[in-house]
C-alpha cells in the first residue's frame, strides 16, 4: 500500500515537471510559447474589434444633441420645495414647521437673483411678455456658447421672496414654484384654443404653455379655495421664448422659466390633494411616471 502511494505521488510530481522530456504540466517550453502567443493574438483581435465598434458608434453620436431626439420622453413637471412623499404640512404660527420648505425655495431661486444675471455676454432680455420660441442657430460649436434669457424674480409676485421672505407660509398661504424639466431641443406646443374650453379659467395664448392646479378629487376641489398664478406677463404658464434649450455645453447658465402658484385660502386642518398639470400638443402623461407633464402634492395647513 505504501508502494502504491509513493508511485501515485511520483506520477503527480512527474506531471508537474517531467525532467526527462523537459515538460511543465504536459507541455514543453515551445508548446507553452505557441499557446500563449495564440491567446495574446486572439484576445488582442477581440479587443481591437470592440474598440473599433465603440469608435464607429461614437462617430454617430453628437455631444450636443441626442441622435434619436424623437424618442426622448416629454419633459416632467416638478415643484419647489422638493419634498419627500410630496407632502407639505405646517402651522403658520410655528416657523420651525415650514422652515425647511422656505429654505428649499430660497436655495433654488439663488441663481434667479439679479446679481447672478448681470453678465451681458451670457444673459439677454427677452421681453416682459410671452413671445415665440427663440432660435439660436444649429446645435454646433461654430457660434460658441449661446446667450440665455434673463428671468426676473419680480415676475413671481407674492412668491418672489422680495416682499415676503416666508413665501406665504407665515400667513397660511403657501407658494410653490413650478418648472418644466429641461429637455434638449424641446419646443413646447401650446394646446389649441378649442381644447381649453373644457377647463374653466384657462385662457388661450399662442406663446404660453399653460399650467393649471386643481383639486385631485371632488372633495379636494371644494377645499382648495382660490389659486393665484405668477409668471412672466402674469401668464399662468411657461413663455415660449425660453425654448429651445441648447444643453449644458452651449447654454451652461440657462434659466428655466418659472411659474409660481399660491393657495390663498385652503381649508384648515385638512389634507388636500392637488394636481398641477401642463397642457400642450407635445406634452404627454404616463401612469408609470407621475411627474411626466404633471405632479401631485398634498398640502395641509394646521391651526
Curated annotation (Swiss-Prot):
- Tell me where in this chain the PTM Phosphoserine is found: 11
Main location per the UniProt record: membrane
Output the superkingdom of the source species. Answer: Eukaryota
Q: Do you know which InterPro entries this protein is assigned to?
A: Na/K_ATPase_sub_beta, Na/K_ATPase_sub_beta_sf
| Glycosylation-annotated residues | 158, 193, 265
Positions in the Extracellular compartment? 63-303
Disulfide topology: 126-149, 159-175, 213-276
UniProt-listed Gene3D superfamilies: 1.20.5.170, Na, k-atpase alpha subunit
Where does it reside? Cell membrane; Apical cell membrane; Cell membrane, Sarcolemma
**Under the GO molecular function aspect, what terms does this record hold?**
ATPase activator activity
Q: Write out the entry's keywords from A to Z.
A: Cell adhesion, Cell membrane, Disulfide bond, Glutathionylation, Glycoprotein, Immunity, Innate immunity, Ion transport, Membrane, Phosphoprotein, Potassium, Potassium transport, Signal-anchor, Sodium, Sodium transport, Sodium/potassium transport, Transmembrane, Transmembrane helix, Transport
Q: Where is this region: immunoglobulin-like?
A: 191-303
Q: Does the keyword DNA-binding apply?
A: no
One GO term of the cellular component aspect?
apical plasma membrane
The UniProt transmembrane annotation reads 35-62
Domain remark from Swiss-Prot or TrEMBL: The C-terminal lobe folds into an immunoglobulin-like domain and mediates cell adhesion properties.
Q: What is this protein called?
A: Sodium/potassium-transporting ATPase subunit beta-1
Q: What organism, scientifically named, is this protein from?
A: Macaca fascicularis
Q: Which gene encodes it?
A: ATP1B1
Amino acid at each position: 500500500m505504501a508502494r502504491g502511494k509513493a508511485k501515485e505521488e511520483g506520477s503527480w510530481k512527474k506531471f508537474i515537471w517531467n525532467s526527462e522530456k523537459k515538460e511543465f504540466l504536459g507541455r514543453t517550453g515551445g508548446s507553452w510559447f505557441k499557446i500563449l502567443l495564440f491567446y495574446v493574438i486572439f484576445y488582442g483581435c477581440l479587443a481591437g474589434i470592440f474598440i473599433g465598434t465603440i469608435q464607429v458608434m461614437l462617430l454617430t453620436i453628437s455631444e450636443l444633441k441626442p441622435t434619436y431626439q424623437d424618442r426622448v420622453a416629454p419633459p416632467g413637471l416638478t415643484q419647489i420645495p422638493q419634498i419627500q412623499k410630496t407632502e407639505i404640512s405646517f402651522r403658520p404660527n410655528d416657523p420651525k414647521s415650514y422652515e425647511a420648505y422656505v429654505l428649499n425655495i430660497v436655495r433654488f431661486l439663488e441663481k434667479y437673483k439679479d446679481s447672478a444675471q448681470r453678465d451681458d455676454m451670457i444673459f439677454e432680455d427677452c421681453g416682459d411678455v410671452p413671445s415665440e420660441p427663440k432660435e439660436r442657430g444649429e446645435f454646433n460649436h461654430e457660434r460658441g456658447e449661446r446667450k440665455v434669457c434673463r428671468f426676473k424674480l419680480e415676475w413671481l409676485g407674492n412668491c418672489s421672496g422680495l416682499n415676503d421672505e416666508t413665501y406665504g407660509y407665515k400667513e397660511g398661504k403657501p407658494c410653490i414654484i413650478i418648472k418644466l424639466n429641461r429637455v434638449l431641443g424641446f419646443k413646447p406646443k401650446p394646446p389649441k384654443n378649442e381644447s381649453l374650453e373644457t377647463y374653466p379659467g384657462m385662457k388661450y395664448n399662442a406663446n404660453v404653455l399653460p399650467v393649471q392646479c386643481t383639486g385631485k378629487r371632488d372633495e379636494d376641489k371644494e377645499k382648495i379655495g382660490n389659486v393665484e398664478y405668477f409668471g412672466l406677463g402674469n401668464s399662468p404658464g411657461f413663455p415660449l421664448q425660453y425654448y429651445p434649450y441648447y444643453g449644458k455645453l452651449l447654454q451652461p447658465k440657462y434659466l428655466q422659466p418659472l411659474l409660481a402658484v399660491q393657495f390663498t385660502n385652503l381649508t384648515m386642518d385638512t389634507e388636500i390633494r392637488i394636481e398641477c398639470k401642463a397642457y400642450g400638443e407635445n406634452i404627454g402623461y404616463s401612469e408609470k411616471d407621475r411627474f411626466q407633464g404633471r405632479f401631485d402634492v398634498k398640502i395641509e395647513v394646521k391651526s
